[in-house]
Structures are given as structure tokens and as C-alpha cells.
């Protein structure tokens, strides 16, 4: 209800749902240049009844912040780089394991990894999807057209470059809030 009010008052529209039969995926949220991106994408996914979850550093998931992040869909994981010989999963392995534990799971990822400009995206989202054998759904927030939602779905193949080119073609024309802070991954255009 609150999501509909926010989107309506601010003149935003919501576009598309998850494809039929997709109840487990890695959902990219891009462009990510402003804190408002979270408000619009989270509102859109709420309206579309997509129960998105997101991973957050376990150090942030302590009282009282866990009372905020938990209800918003946060899942605590250890994101510290694994040291040689350390017996714990990498971040990618930990995220992929979430799909083994949860029948219906949509994990939201911001592939730029920051709200600042960067020419290369982080590829962990791709490796998580590949390892978990789930598709990558392309969530977006387009400030020019005031629309947020889900675009196409990419099923990871054995050719990351070809798959990433498809993803970059989709995002290259999506208008961010701060264009000077956004770039598709230059390696794949």
C-alpha cells in the first residue's frame, strides 16, 4: 500500500513482473547512482509482489539495525575476503548456498557495487547465478521515463562475455538519476 502511494505521488510507473515460472533468481538493480534507487526499485518490486531479499554485511545485521534490515529483506553474510586456508565459503559460494536453503528466493544485487562512477561492474552476481543454476533478472529504475520494474531475463551460459554483452545492451539506454555516476561495463560493449 505504501509503495503504491509513493510511486503514485511521485508520478512513477511500474513495468513487468517476473517471467512465469521464475521464483528463484538473482535480480540486478541498476543503475545505482542514488539512495533513491532503493526507494523506487523496492517500491516497484513490492507492487509487483516480488519478495526481494538482499545480502548485507553480517556486521551491519546486529541490534538495532537488524530490526530495520530484517523486515526489509536483508540476509546477513560474511563478506570479508576469505584468507588462504580459512574454512568458510566465499561470498559467491555463501550467496549461491542461499538458493539451496530457500525454495523461492529473489536476491537483489547492485552490480556496480557503488553509487560512484566505475567502468567495470562486479561479476559476483553472474557467478552466483551460474553456481546456483538460477536466471538473472534485470531490474531497473529509469529516471527519464519515471518507470521501474523488471526487464529481460538472462540464463547464464558458459560464455560470460556473451551474456554480459546482452545485459549491457539492456542497461545502456536506462536513464540513471545521476548520469555522470553511471556506466555499463566497458569490457562488454
Regions from the PLM with identified roles:
Residues 1-2:
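Helix-enriched interaction subdomains in cytosolic or periplasmic regions
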Residues 8-173, 187-188:
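Soluble catalytic domains of membrane acyltransferases
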Residues 176-189:
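Charged, glycine-interspersed solvent-exposed loop segments at helix/strand-loop junctions
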Amino acid at each position: 500500500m505504501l509503495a503504491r502511494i509513493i510511486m503514485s505521488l511521485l508520478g512513477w510507473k511500474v513495468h513487468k513482473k517476473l517471467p512465469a515460472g521464475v521464483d528463484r533468481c538473482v535480480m540486478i538493480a541498476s543503475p545505482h547512482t542514488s539512495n533513491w534507487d532503493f526507494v523506487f526499485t523496492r517500491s516497484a518490486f513490492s507492487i509487483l509482489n516480488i519478495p526481494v531479499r538482499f545480502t548485507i554485511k553480517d556486521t551491519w545485521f546486529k541490534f538495532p539495525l537488524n530490526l530495520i534490515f530484517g523486515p526489509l529483506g536483508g540476509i546477513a553474510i560474511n563478506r570479508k575476503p576469505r584468507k588462504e586456508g580459512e574454512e568458510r565459503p566465499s561470498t559467491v559460494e555463501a550467496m549461491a548456498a542461499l538458493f539451496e536453503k530457500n525454495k523461492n528466493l529473489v536476491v537483489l544485487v547492485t552490480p556496480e557495487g557503488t553509487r560512484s562512477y566505475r567502468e567495470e561492474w562486479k561479476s559476483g552476481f553472474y557467478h552466483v547465478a551460474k553456481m546456483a543454476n538460477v536466471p538473472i533478472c534485470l531490474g531497473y529504475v529509469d529516471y527519464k521515463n519515471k518507470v521501474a520494474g523488471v526487464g529481460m531475463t538472462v540464463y547464464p551460459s558458459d560464455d560470460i562475455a556473451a551474456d554480459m554483452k546482452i545485459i549491457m545492451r539492456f542497461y545502456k539506454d536506462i536513464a540513471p538519476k545521476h548520469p555522470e555516476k553511471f556506466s555499463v561495463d566497458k569490457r562488454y560493449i
